Amino acid sequence: MNYFILLFVATFLLLDVNCKKDGYPVDANNCKFECWKNEYCDELCKAKRAESGYCYKLKLSCWCEGLPDDEPTKTSDRCYGTGR
């Protein structure tokens, strides 16, 4: 039984499992991308290797679904360099 568990864990490590996340993508200044149209956000998110994206109208910001874990997303309200 222990060998089965060890083999199972080793298989996952070898497969390099990529996790996905959802969130607001950010630029180099940690600022969200402003938007008006869903098409703009969908293209932006897919360029960042996400599955899809849309314009979240209440915040006028792009929201991406299925972003790779290594892609930065908005974690604070701070936007460096622009005062926003």
Curated annotation (Swiss-Prot):
Tissue expression per record:
Expressed by the venom gland.
Q: What is its main location?
A: secreted
Instruction: Family membership, please give it.
Output: Belongs to the long (4 C-C) scorpion toxin superfamily. Sodium channel inhibitor family. Alpha subfamily.
Q: Which CDD domains match?
A: neurotoxins_LC_scorpion
Q: Which PROSITE patterns match?
A: LCN_CSAB
Positions of modified residues (Threonine amide): T82
Annotated protein name in UniProt: Beta-toxin Ct16
Sorted alphabetically, the keyword list is: Amidation, Disulfide bond, Ion channel impairing toxin, Neurotoxin, Secreted, Signal, Toxin, Voltage-gated sodium channel impairing toxin
GO MF terms on file? Answer: sodium channel inhibitor activity; toxin activity
Q: Which GO terms describe its biological process?
A: defense response
According to its UniProt entry, the function of this protein is described as: Alpha toxins bind voltage-independently at site-3 of sodium channels (Nav) and inhibit the inactivation of the activated channels, thereby blocking neuronal transmission. Is possibly toxic to mice.
Give each disulfide bond as a residue pair.
Answer: C31-C79, C35-C55, C41-C62, C45-C64
Family annotation (SUPFAM superfamilies)? Scorpion toxin-like (SSF57095)
User: What domain notes does the record hold?
Assistant: Has the structural arrangement of an alpha-helix connected to antiparallel beta-sheets by disulfide bonds (CS-alpha/beta).
Q: Where does it reside? A: Secreted
Which source organism?
Centruroides tecomanus (Scorpion)
Where do the LCN-type CS-alpha/beta domain residues begin and end? Answer: 21-80
